[in-house]
Every structure is written in structure tokens, then in C-alpha cells.
């Protein structure tokens, strides 16, 4: 499912002394099946744009087309329930939204709210729990007895239980340790392919953008200031610095190496790309000497 913004402006509390313009002339398409990263410094408009992705907010002017549905400033809220089933949002710290007595009931709540029978919803709950890598023995447990990482996966299972076509991830690894963050991001990558999802990732983690995204949207002061592939976005450190953004760690290290004489035809985004570029520049017998030294 594609999402297209056309000449979208959004203003909070229009016509009041507290009027604040948050989005200006947004024109962009998130393609079906893509993995799009949305980046920008705090206050750039990311969260406001995110809430337009399933019409939690409606544009003050312009249109947002979600699949075949066109959202305008006058679209009635009562017509949006089914649409929101198709665009699932995993908000920051989603485990804080858990509330039911058992894991099964919490995951099943969404499907039942959209008309599924209790039996079908509980069956879906078991399937979604397995999908996020948790054992079915947890179904009868209270979600509040689980570890923080397990609680987050249960909350994500609840979003997936709605069978969304678009999965929006708002800082999904916030508060996790490095291994937990890696496991979570690998899970989303797997789900994207297994469920044929369109994924939108809102993050401050440039490494995750480099490793997982196909497309990047950069926001600043309520406007889209650049779009492109991760390689296109991260090729200009000075531009990123001017917009209060950083580089992936691997790319930053490559820039340091360049100052010491190393050459790169294109900036590496991943550790594997960096390693390959370094090996190409080593003397012909260097790797053999390293192997002999290790022995």
C-alpha cells in the first residue's frame, strides 16, 4: 500500500493565539513494499507527519492518499476506522499501551474490535506471538510479568494482529541495549519480507537507516529538505551537520580513514562494505601476512 502526500500543510490550533504551523508543502510518495526511513532533528515535523500516515491527524490543506483512500481536511473521522486497520503504528515504548489480563487477550483486542470472533482473535493472537519470536506458553501470562523486551514484542504482536499493510515504527528500539536493538531491527526486516509490508521507520539511529532502509526522507522545520537512498543522503557530512544530523558509524569511520589517505569510490554504509573497501587497498600479500601472524 502506497501513501502519497500532495501539497500538505498542517497547523496545530489554527485561528487561536497558539497557532503553530508544523508541516509546509509536503509532497512525497512512500512506495508500496518500500522500507522508508524518516529522519530529522527533534522538532523537524517527523511526529506530525507520522500521524498523517493513518489519519490520526488530517491535513489543514492538501491531500494524503493512503492506498485508494484520499484524506482531505473535511474527511469524517467515522469513515477512517477501517483505514486505520491497514496502517499499524508502533509508537515509542509500545509496551506502555498493554492493559489486558493476559497476553492472549491483549493481542486479540484489536481484531475483536474490528469484528473478529473471540475464537478467531485468540487464534490470531497465538500466530502473531510466534511471529514476533515468543513462545505460546506466554499466552496465558500477564503481560506485566514479562521482561521489557518481551512486553515490547507482545505490543508489536498486537499491532500485527490487525493484519496491516503498512507498518509505521516510531523509534522502535528506544531504551533497548545494542543486542536488543539489533534483534528488534532484524525482526522488522524479516516481517517486512514475510508479510509483504510497507515499512516506515522514524529514528535517530543512522546505523539503522543505513542497514535497513531503501529510501530516506529528511525533514527540517516542517519541510522535506531531501529524499534519496541512504547512500545519497549520507554522502555529504557537511549538509547533514547543517541539518543537525549525523552519519552512520561506519561511514563516519570511513571519512576519518580518508583524511589519513585511504580512498573510497563511494562511502561505505555497512561494516561489510567498509571491510571490502579496505581489503581492496591493502598490499597484495597483506592478508597472507595477517593470516600467518594469527597462526
UniProtKB/Swiss-Prot annotation:
<keyword id="KW-0813">Transport</keyword>
<dbReference type="InterPro" id="IPR015856">
    <property type="entry name" value="ABC_transpr_CbiO/EcfA_su"/>
</dbReference>
<comment type="similarity">
    <text>Belongs to the ABC transporter superfamily. Energy-coupling factor EcfA family.</text>
</comment>
<keyword id="KW-0067">ATP-binding</keyword>
<keyword id="KW-1003">Cell membrane</keyword>
<feature type="domain" description="ABC transporter">
    <location>
        <begin position="3"/>
        <end position="246"/>
    </location>
</feature>
<feature type="binding site">
    <location>
        <begin position="40"/>
        <end position="47"/>
    </location>
    <ligand>
        <name>ATP</name>
    </ligand>
</feature>
<dbReference type="GO" id="GO:0005524">
    <property type="term" value="F:ATP binding"/>
</dbReference>
<dbReference type="GO" id="GO:0043190">
    <property type="term" value="C:ATP-binding cassette (ABC) transporter complex"/>
</dbReference>
<dbReference type="InterPro" id="IPR017871">
    <property type="entry name" value="ABC_transporter-like_CS"/>
</dbReference>
<dbReference type="GO" id="GO:0042626">
    <property type="term" value="F:ATPase-coupled transmembrane transporter activity"/>
</dbReference>
<keyword id="KW-0547">Nucleotide-binding</keyword>
<dbReference type="InterPro" id="IPR050095">
    <property type="entry name" value="ECF_ABC_transporter_ATP-bd"/>
</dbReference>
<keyword id="KW-1278">Translocase</keyword>
<dbReference type="InterPro" id="IPR003439">
    <property type="entry name" value="ABC_transporter-like_ATP-bd"/>
</dbReference>
<dbReference type="Pfam" id="PF00005">
    <property type="entry name" value="ABC_tran"/>
</dbReference>
<comment type="function">
    <text>ATP-binding (A) component of a common energy-coupling factor (ECF) ABC-transporter complex. Unlike classic ABC transporters this ECF transporter provides the energy necessary to transport a number of different substrates.</text>
</comment>
<dbReference type="InterPro" id="IPR003593">
    <property type="entry name" value="AAA+_ATPase"/>
</dbReference>
<comment type="subunit">
    <text>Forms a stable energy-coupling factor (ECF) transporter complex composed of 2 membrane-embedded substrate-binding proteins (S component), 2 ATP-binding proteins (A component) and 2 transmembrane proteins (T component).</text>
</comment>
<dbReference type="InterPro" id="IPR030946">
    <property type="entry name" value="EcfA2"/>
</dbReference>
<protein>
    <recommendedName>
        <fullName>Energy-coupling factor transporter ATP-binding protein EcfA2</fullName>
        <ecNumber>7.-.-.-</ecNumber>
    </recommendedName>
</protein>
<dbReference type="InterPro" id="IPR027417">
    <property type="entry name" value="P-loop_NTPase"/>
</dbReference>
<keyword id="KW-0472">Membrane</keyword>
<dbReference type="GO" id="GO:0016887">
    <property type="term" value="F:ATP hydrolysis activity"/>
</dbReference>
